[in-house]
Amino acid sequence: MKVLVIIDVQNDFLINGSLEVPDGNDVIEPINEIIKNYALVVATKDWHPLDHVSFASNHQGKKIGDVVKVNNLDQILWPVHCVQESKGSDFPTTLNIKAINKIIYKGTNSQIDSYSGFNDNGKIRSTGLSDYLKTKNVTSIDYVG
């Protein structure tokens, strides 16, 4: 089975978001076009607690863009973004969320970041994505976002 994995298409990464990606909104329409070609669609969400280690505001004297060591890993400091249950963590209303079969939450541990949809940055804790894809007998993965 083939799966489409939508990576972190969330309000905080779009226009006027706290961690805006230039032209980030431009991915939404193409995703909505191709999503209908997949029987299985998974979306990842950055889903941070307010005390997350990646937020510059949680490191006294540090600013956005600084790099600090946390648990022997380099951590880039970001603005507060994709806080659990916030509008910034939501999918944009223009994304066809009805086609999403499963949401994988990442970055949920306040002490370690998770850039990957599969594991945290230290590869200590899985997000469950790999196990989920195995249960669905996935043989091919297409990524967008």
Predicted regions and their residues:
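Active-site alpha/beta core segments
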Residues: E29-S140
